[in-house]
């Protein structure tokens, strides 16, 4: 079986070449060809000796996930569905803005965490993505988006906020992050790469030590009672532990704040009292808030907060001195908005079946 070199960061690729009797510097050459030139076969790598190209063709491969579908929203948002085998597909979304181009990348086929307001969570869970399947999303998007008139890459920022919980696929995500940051890969700065987590505290500590990129935390509640209901992981790592982990992370973080993501659910977490509880909760954590109007999906059981409730909630936080943004809903006409990514998941958890039974019971 051939070795897919897309699974290696520079350290791994260097080790691979050394193990196969080749000069270690070849790793940098091959990495640049794969990630900066978008090469898909070794014959394109003209600065490698023919004998090495032949050897690589015999022993190795560059396997990119295949494109299943591409869509473009009326607002310029683009979504790609990529085939990761055995009937599974993951979604990657590009969001254009005036000062940046952000790519939202998936880390798992489905998600095991069962956050109740998230479409991905309803799809169940199949498996972790490999490092090649994670970085392959950036490879595809770079190929599709090209460069600006100034010969700069259109994709300037990456957020690990697609399908799945990145911290639950720690090793493969870290390898992909290493490729993103490497000057022989995509050359992104740590400040422009963000990992989002629902609050896996031990993995937050590990990421701080090995790959401290910008951090976003899917908070979504101001107290344990509400968060236990909508983010079940909170029962394992309650808010007090999560806030302490955020403080520890900031010691090595490239930014001096944590971004707290907060989906606005009508009547659940969007009242003035919740905003005041939030202020008390995060008082020792330098942070900013990203309020996310809930993006409906069929049979979710939730409603989007009213614009008035979102405004009042935002104003309370701002008056307390916090930086607060209300996320614009982008790509909702192609189901590319936050919380809508579902891909194609061959569920191994029977979660889809469970939700169908619940819905049938409600209808009965």
Curated annotation (Swiss-Prot):
UniProt catalytic activity: adenosine(2503) in 23S rRNA + 2 reduced [2Fe-2S]-[ferredoxin] + 2 S-adenosyl-L-methionine = 2-methyladenosine(2503) in 23S rRNA + 5'-deoxyadenosine + L-methionine + 2 oxidized [2Fe-2S]-[ferredoxin] + S-adenosyl-L-homocysteine; adenosine(37) in tRNA + 2 reduced [2Fe-2S]-[ferredoxin] + 2 S-adenosyl-L-methionine = 2-methyladenosine(37) in tRNA + 5'-deoxyadenosine + L-methionine + 2 oxidized [2Fe-2S]-[ferredoxin] + S-adenosyl-L-homocysteine
Pfam family of the protein (one): RlmN_N
A GO MF term: 4 iron, 4 sulfur cluster binding
Active site: 91 (proton acceptor), 338 (s-methylcysteine intermediate)
EC number: 2.1.1.192
Intrachain disulfide bonds: 104-338
Keyword line: 4Fe-4S, Cytoplasm, Disulfide bond, Iron, Iron-sulfur, Metal-binding, Methyltransferase, rRNA processing, S-adenosyl-L-methionine, Transferase, tRNA processing
Leader sequence segment: none
Positions with a binding annotation for [4Fe-4S] cluster: 111, 115, 118
Miscellaneous comment in the UniProt entry for this protein: Reaction proceeds by a ping-pong mechanism involving intermediate methylation of a conserved cysteine residue.
Purpose of the protein: Specifically methylates position 2 of adenine 2503 in 23S rRNA and position 2 of adenine 37 in tRNAs. m2A2503 modification seems to play a crucial role in the proofreading step occurring at the peptidyl transferase center and thus would serve to optimize ribosomal fidelity.
Name of the protein this chain belongs to: Dual-specificity RNA methyltransferase RlmN
Organism: Neisseria meningitidis serogroup C (strain 053442)
Lineage per the UniProt record: Bacteria, Pseudomonadati, Pseudomonadota, Betaproteobacteria, Neisseriales
């Amino acid at each position: 079986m051939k070795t897919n070199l897309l699974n290696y960061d520079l350290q791994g690729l260097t080790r691979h070449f050394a193990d196969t009797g080749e000069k270690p510097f070849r790793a940098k050459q091959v990495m640049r060809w794969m990630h900066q030139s978008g090469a898909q076969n070794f014959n394109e790598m003209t600065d490698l000796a023919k004998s090495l190209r032949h050897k690589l063709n015999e022993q190795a491969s560059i396997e990119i996930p295949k494109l299943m579908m591409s869509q473009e929203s009326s607002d310029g948002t683009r979504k790609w569905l990529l085939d990761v085998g055995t009937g599974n597909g993951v979604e990657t979304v590009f969001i254009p803005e005036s000062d940046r181009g952000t790519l939202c990348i998936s880390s798992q086929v489905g998600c095991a965490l069962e956050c109740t307001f998230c479409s991905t969570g309803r799809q169940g869970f199949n498996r972790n993505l490999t490092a090649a399947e994670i970085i392959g999303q950036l490879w595809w998007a770079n190929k599709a988006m090209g460069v600006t008139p100034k010969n700069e890459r259109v994709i300037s920022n990456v957020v690990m906020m697609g399908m799945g919980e990145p911290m639950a696929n720690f090793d493969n995500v870290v390898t992909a992050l290493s490729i993103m940051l490497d000057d022989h890969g995509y050359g992104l700065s740590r400040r422009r790469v963000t990992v989002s987590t629902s609050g896996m505290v031990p993995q937050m500590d590990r990421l701080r030590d090995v790959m401290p990129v910008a951090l976003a935390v899917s908070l979504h509640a101001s107290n344990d009672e509400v968060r236990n209901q909508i983010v079940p992981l909170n029962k394992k790592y309650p808010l007090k532990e999560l806030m302490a982990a955020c403080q520890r992370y900031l010691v090595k973080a490239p930014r001096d704040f944590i971004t707290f993501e907060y989906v606005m659910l009508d009547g659940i977490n969007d009242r003035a009292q919740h905003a005041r509880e939030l202020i008390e909760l995060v008082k020792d954590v330098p942070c900013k808030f990203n309020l996310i109007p809930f993006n409906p999906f069929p049979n979710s059981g939730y409603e989007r907060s009213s614009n008035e409730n979102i405004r009042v909630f935002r104003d309370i936080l701002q008056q307390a001195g916090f930086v607060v943004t209300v996320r614009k809903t982008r790509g909702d006409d192609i189901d590319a908005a936050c919380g809508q990514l579902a891909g194609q998941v061959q569920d191994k958890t029977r979660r889809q079946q469970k939700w169908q039974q619940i819905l049938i019971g409600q209808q009965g």
